[in-house]
Amino acid sequence: MDMEMDFLKPTEVFRFFAEINRIPRPSKKEKRMIAYLEQFARERSLECEMDETGNVLIRKGATPGMENRKTVILQSHMDMVCEKNREVEFDFEKDAIRTWVDGDWLRADGTTLGADDGIGVAMELALLDASDIAHGPIECVFTRDEETGLSGAFGMKPGFMSGDILLNLDSEDEGQLFVSCAGGAATTAEFDFTPVDVPQDYFFFEVKVKGLTGGHSGDDINKKRANANKILARFLYNAWAKYDLYLCDIQAGGLHNAIPREAMAVCAIPMKDKESVRVDWNLFSADVEEEFSVTEKTMVFELQSESARLKAVDREVARKLIWTLQAVHNGILSMSQDMDLVETSSNLASIRLTDGNKILVKTSQRSSILSARHHVSNMVKAAFELAGARVEVGEGYPGWKMNPESDILKIAVETYKALFGREPKVLGIHAGLECGLFSEKYPGLDMVSFGPTLRGVHSPDERLLIPTVAMVWEHIKAILKNIPAKA
């Protein structure tokens, strides 16, 4: 065990966390972790299976007197995000994670810690290794490649798991029980255009919106943050109605799962309108700044002269593009009827003028209800098809709708109250979890997701709040002790 982890409690959990942090396990490169899990099972004479995707399942029989209880699946993912500070010398495919204790926090030395979801893996291993914990039949499942596409959960075939209840150990706030997540899909539109000449004596300028807060397009979609792409589209729509405008370039947004922070377009208008468009831009900027005065305190608007461009997007395609960007839905579409949570949303993620005289627009839709996700994807698809674009809706991944009658939720809440004297928070998340895929492949599987407190995940600032590991460990043991008998 790492020197800094010798004294951490619970010892049985941190012993295994230290072990697996010596094993390189980048997403899509989990072979050594799979081999470790298989050897772990052999050494303890536990039944072990691996499916064709690389997911590993280890079964353990019930302790005496618990044989008639429902089978519980405990699930975590074996891969980790591999990020390091620029100055740090570290090879994620060879080196062991170096850890240190900072007060109540466990950190890594300039790299991701791997507690997402290594601490979940460690708790499963500690349970499989223990001889003094009461439980019914259990299946410990370790999925691969969660971080870069959920491919382990995607590839899992129905029947691989056989339990009645699933405890997902991949949440990041102790005291919170997650019972719902959104499914998602990407919708991409592609416009073809004919390059045209810009008339003589036209003023070329670049408009840019930047410095926005941004954030996750699911988790942060309810925080009233501005979308840079929609702001840009709004200005272009107004300018198109007033000026003889040519669109020469547009580069806006970025990742499909991020609220756009920056957007830029290069345009041309008659030279006589040069000063007028500057006034319009300033007035427009003031309006938008007032609208988002609370959430966008660092938003910046720029208009700069540009050198002349030889070509622009043909007028008809430019008009259809701008009008569609103005019209297409962005943000929350509906809220859940079961809890205070966004149910369905859409994000206008990126707009790119590319080589080959094409403009590519990427959007993403999310919902915890499959039919609602299809509906919002079709709304976006129809808007772009009306404008003559080719549109493709990706296969996507399913959501997980809250079950208000969930037995495992009731058990998790009551055992938490008995242990800690307070109510846990019951929440959903407007983002994807492996539970969404499990709910599709295993209809009727009763699930809840929870875990110890993590901060800075997916970054070298990742850290684990040590005392919460013991709390979650005790909660798991209490849940297992209270699992009901099979019907």
Task: Report residues per predicted region.
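His/Asp/Glu-rich mid-to-C-terminal helical/loop segments that flank catalytic regions of hydrolases
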Residues: 225-242, 271-274, 319-324, 332-336, ...
